[in-house]
Amino acid sequence: MARIQGVDLPNDKRVEIGLTAIYGIGRQSSNKILAKLGINPDTRVKDLTESELSDIRNELDNYLTEGDLRRDVAMNIKRLKEINCYRGSRHKKGLPVRGQHTKNNARTRKGPRKQA
């Protein structure tokens, strides 16, 4: 099993899909990386050579992934809460942030119904 950025990539999947197991790398980023390195996206992870894996590791160093990205997102939300903007207050209250109505729905953000 190939280990990149502290994540074990699934051996039986195509490289294009396997790279999406890394937080912050989606299909588009994965395809862009593979095209730049000249690696066939249909290759299975288990068939990658050690040199190809090291090339992928070096290319991923240019991307914000895993812990760094999670920390960055958390710091952005924390900053919104600290400056007491509307979005920050919605984060604090656990309500939808992007303008959705909450009269009937938003159960995911609001949690289970509270009995009166």
Curated annotation (Swiss-Prot):
The record, for InterPro entries, names: Rbsml_uS13_C, Ribosomal_uS13, Ribosomal_uS13-like_H2TH, Ribosomal_uS13_bac-type, Ribosomal_uS13_CS
Assigned keywords, A-Z: Ribonucleoprotein, Ribosomal protein, RNA-binding, rRNA-binding, tRNA-binding
Share an example GO biological-process annotation for this protein.
translation
Q: Which Pfam families match?
A: Ribosomal_S13
Q: Which GO terms describe its cellular component?
A: cytosol; small ribosomal subunit
MF-aspect GO terms: rRNA binding; structural constituent of ribosome; tRNA binding
Region Disordered: start-end pairs: 88-116
Coiled-coil spans in chain? none
Presence of the UniProt keyword tRNA-binding in the record:
yes
In the record, the note on similarity to other proteins reads: Belongs to the universal ribosomal protein uS13 family.
Q: What does the function comment of this entry state? A: Located at the top of the head of the 30S subunit, it contacts several helices of the 16S rRNA. In the 70S ribosome it contacts the 23S rRNA (bridge B1a) and protein L5 of the 50S subunit (bridge B1b), connecting the 2 subunits; these bridges are implicated in subunit movement. Contacts the tRNAs in the A and P-sites.
Its assembly, as annotated, is: Part of the 30S ribosomal subunit. Forms a loose heterodimer with protein S19. Forms two bridges to the 50S subunit in the 70S ribosome.
List the HAMAP family hit by this protein, alphabetically: Ribosomal_uS13
What is the recorded name of this protein? Small ribosomal subunit protein uS13
The gene designation is rpsM
